[in-house]
Amino acid sequence: MHINYYTKHIDLEEEISQEMEKKMAKFEKFADEATLIDLTVEGDLPKKSVKVSLHYNDATHSFYACEEAKDVMTAFNTAKEELFTEITRVIGKERDQSRSKARQAKETIRQTS
């Protein structure tokens, strides 16, 4: 009797996509909940270099942003956006690697069937 394992694994890429969407939703929530733990303003007017540290899930992320001195919160929001962009890039890379592994697994299953 021949069992076709390939059909069982055919939705693996879809499962990976759904998992990555869950991760993205979690980090979208982070973008609203990140806590400002340190903000250091250095330099002279009219521009300052603003160091913004964000803390989330036991990790601290620091960014420097050169902003007009009038609005330091802009630097904080910019740092959150930059962090979210970086997280998105990392998740995209993870997704691509997972999809590649899924394709390899499918090919291996197909060859051994």
Regions found by a protein language model. Give the residues of each.
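N-terminal, polar/charged subdomain of small-to-medium soluble alpha/beta proteins
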Residues: 1-113
